[in-house]
Amino acid sequence: MKQIINLFLPNLKSMRTVFYEVANTSVSRERFVDFTKIAGLLFLMINSFTLLRLHDSGGEIFVSNLSANSESLMVVTWFTAGMSLFFFSMGFNNLIAWYSNVGRDGSQWNYLVDRINTLLGPVIVWIFSSTIVLNILSRSENFPNYLTTSEDGIMPSIEFILWPLWLVSIYLVMVLFAPFTIYLHKKYPYATVLTLITMTILIDNIDFALNLSYLKLFNYLFFWIVIHQVGYFFADGKIQKVNINVFRYVTVFTYGYLFYQMSASESYLSLASYRLTSLNNEDPPTTIYLIASIGLISLFLSLKNIVENILSNQKLWLLISHIHSNIYTMYLWHLFVFFSIYLFGLTMYYAPLILLITAFIFGNYERSMFKLSSNLVKRVNPLQPWPSPIKARFSINNFALAWLSALLVLLGVIHLTLGGIGQDGFFTLREFYFLRSNTYEGIGRIFIGLLLLNITVRGLKYKKRILGGS
């Protein structure tokens, strides 16, 4: 119980952990990947504070996206497609984590537990804390339950605030499919990526009949696996062998194509829609989003050596690491902060300060779990021989339980993402395809999934302890 309570309380000890990790950072650590991950989430937050606007009109609260009607801001979103940068870095981290677990002791289920716990910790803190705060605020007459979009659509305020959960849902899908995608990358790296890119482009450009329109949703899977797979290429060293000028040419070509599309057609080219308009490039991802993502990743790769040299400065690396140790917390809370600034009549200049205070108060778990490679530990080489099959008893059962537990967590997160937390009451039933439940049941799925997930790792220890005691 004490450990659970400590998750929600600020702790200076967790901040000292960051100093220790920075001092012991391995010289072989890919600091560029850390920078890319941080930049991706910061871009998403910057987009929210610069592109979104809330204003009163005729008793309604209108939410607008400035990039929807401004060509110059549309161009800005091409360079701030932060979610693509984030999942590129996650592809790198997930492949390294897979080999760290499977390559050493063959525990594929331990990989799932580690990867999911890393992000779900801050998410659980956020869900519980925001549930309490939002339900208190919603009792106020000044709290708008719904927002009106530019197309006269209605969006629940809570759903708007919980938009960051979409990243969590995609992250969980990438982790769930990682064992399969890593196998494909090992056997058919280039064929896999080319096939996924082709499928993404075809699904986006084919006009399906109305009864087959659901096929467009497959681009959620194909598109993000493509970006994730590119991170695999960086992790196993294939990208590092490419001449840096190639990335510069790809950057010029992709952005040149986007500028051509802007001048030659009337296509909607913003990459930051926040589900506020029927026309968008993220829901599901389109060819335009794919081209912009490839261009942005290539731009970052062309600057890799410069970034690495800058991050070799220990003081700057300390600053970056402090941001890194709180980045999930800041990202999850940033739309809550944005909405609160409007609600209390503050200016956006307060946003950085409020975000820092929020990260200090609610980021204790993330900081305490923050790890950088120690000088005493060598990074696992992804090029090592493919791990032999596990010989441990019931290993298939453990992996199946871990996978199904992760799926249960994913369903709970999707339910909260679409239904909101406490919107119109905790017991209001919400429907999404085959999901039909209230908020308590959605949160229950997450906790049951996490409980079962962690049993796959810790269950054997408990069994040995019980048998040893008897």
Language-model features: locations:
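Alpha-helical transmembrane segments and their immediate juxtamembrane cytosolic regions
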Residues: 2-470
